[in-house]
Amino acid sequence: HEKGLVDCEAPLREFLAVMERLGDKLGPILAQFAYVAKGKDANEYATGASFRERLAPFLALWPKERPLAVEVRNATWIAPPLLDLLKERGIPLALSAYYTMPAPEKLFAGPDPRTAELTYVRFIGDHKKMDALVARLSRKGARASDWGALAVDKAPEMRRWAGVLKSAARGPALAYCNNHYAGFAPDSARSFRDLWDKVPS
């Protein structure tokens, strides 16, 4: 997102050429876009219109055989204009457990965020809050290392995500976890997998 999706055809070709070296290990590629603050651009904060204008030609460049997911961090952008753009191309909107984004129940109460067969979810968390918590616990000697164990219990939230997503999934589902979500990404991933398996099909 550093180039703002402008004049990125050559860098995109180079990037994809490198990624293809991963072969069968390469999964869907995530295009992550930053939050736009209201104070920076009130209209863009509310609508994402400029972002969509730049996103459409970028998606036209993207090879159909290479799976892509698109992540935004403005909740107001999860609306028909963006959803329809992604749906036309069969590209999943990445669903995010992030402090600027809606909880799963609220997310699915609005326009249907499913834009493809693939469900793609990211457990991101709040970087500033988690950094502060981990630093505080480390100073107290409550952690052997900064990111070696869970710092908070996110099981109730993940259980809600699992229930909503499993009932809404149209095909395969992929979940990715960040250390900043609960303090240790591998344990968060294991926890979500276990919770997912307990949700009735």
Residue ranges and their predicted role:
Residues 1-201:
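Residues lining hydrophobic/aromatic ligand-binding pockets adjacent to catalytic sites
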